[in-house]
Swiss-Prot record:
Domain TNase-like as annotated: residue spans: 53-261
Effect of disrupting the coding gene: Leads to long chronological lifespan.
Intracellular or extracellular location(s): Mitochondrion; Membrane
Binding annotation for Ca(2+): D156
EC top class named in words: hydrolase
Signal peptide: none
Segments crossing the lipid bilayer: 15-32
Molecular function via GO: endonuclease activity; metal ion binding
Enzyme Commission designation: 3.1.-.-
Annotated protein name in UniProt: Probable endonuclease LCL3
GO CC, alphabetical: membrane; mitochondrion
Phylogenetic classification of the source organism: Eukaryota, Fungi, Dikarya, Ascomycota, Saccharomycotina
UniProt superkingdom: Eukaryota
Amino acid sequence: MREGDSNSKKSADVAVLSIILTGSTLTLIYTYKRYLTQFKRTNDIPRRIFRKHWLYGKVTSVGDGDNFHFFHMPGGIRGGWGWLRPVPQMIKNDSTAEKLVGDSRNMRFFNFNWITHGRSTKSKIQKAKSQFLKLNVPYKNRKNLPTIPIRLCGIDAPERAHFGNPAQPFGNEALIWLQNRILGKKVWVKPLSIDQYNRCVARVSYWDWFGGWKDLSLEMLKDGLAVVYEGKVNTEFDDREDKYRYYEFLARSRKKGLWIQNKFETPGEYKKRI
């Protein structure tokens, strides 16, 4: 082979190799940006994700009965989480649920005139509350992490004490229930919209070893710790409104959770009043 032909072949090989390397690099960059980029705040989530895709991650903090903070872990173990990319470690909780939220037995049921109908009704309410206060909250909340605030779609949990206003009955119990179910655990989140507080309104699914995949909003309705969302703004159900209303009806007819009360003010009514 002549020297000129040899040089031409080498140049062609180098060109082909360069094209392959460039293509592979661009493919890796595209794959990483599209599938492995971590979203650290609500506004990081691309519009293409909403209503179509699910995000995987860990619950690092639960501050209320219908919202929590979500640490996004795209790709899970295959995305390097736990061996290449650090996952926030939770701190074990030594306090009981009652100490975390205060003793609900001494709380007023409402901050307006409401008279219980006999001791039996009050006793039933306290009994209903106690089953939730006994739930185990295994971890403490982790704060100051790059997390997305998540608002559960389709439901409204009783309000806890905020800005000097008293808590609604079962507000603390809803918080404890939610902490027991998801704090420190992995969940799947389907973004639906962004609310006025810059929270991601989402449908949330978690794994239960005894019942498979669970819809978190639906489970709260079943246990009588939330009502179907009444607001007209940022109303999201992900095509499950009828199902949510059906299980709310069942919980109400069976007097589960907050429905044990003879007179009940919904979270929406409470927020309008205060």
